[in-house]
Amino acid sequence: FRIVSENVRLKAFDQCGIDAASPYYVKVGRGHAQHKRYMLLFTCLQYRCVHLELLSSLDTCSFLLAFERFIARRVKPSRCVTDNGLNFRGGEKELREIWNRFDHEQIREKHSSIEWWFNPPASPSMGGVFEIMVKCCKRAVTTIIPNHTLTEEELSTAFAMAENIVNSRPISYISNDVGDLE
């Protein structure tokens, strides 16, 4: 589907794809207890830049908190495209209910304009853009921390480093020819 026309320039993350990636194991406390943590990926659908958040679980509450962190750090998107995960469906529903409860017009205007698009169930290929970015980010994280169990802070730092690596890549072909200026 076509996101925007050629003449319209949007700010980064105005339209984003959201996906959660496979678990990473972290050490908690002084013992040897390991807990699962997940990577939540926000992909800008226009510029292909990424934002990574650490999820403590795949429940709706964890997603909503990560989504609020994303909005606080980046921008409130006008459109979110995601798969049919229960945490995303529940998150969208809870956000709508919470925003409708407030009587303050400012708060309602701030968040109610987000349009949610869900890919059809059981079709991960429909989220091609952000599925490819998940692959890039997972590869970057694996390069940074191969087969190590980290603390949550170390994993969060690894996510920030991976985000930097992925966002630093060229988005178009770079020629090796010095005379080629295009």
Language-model-derived ranges and their functions:
Residues 1-135, 139:
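Retroviral integrase
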Residues 109-182:
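Charged alpha-helix within mobile-element recombinases
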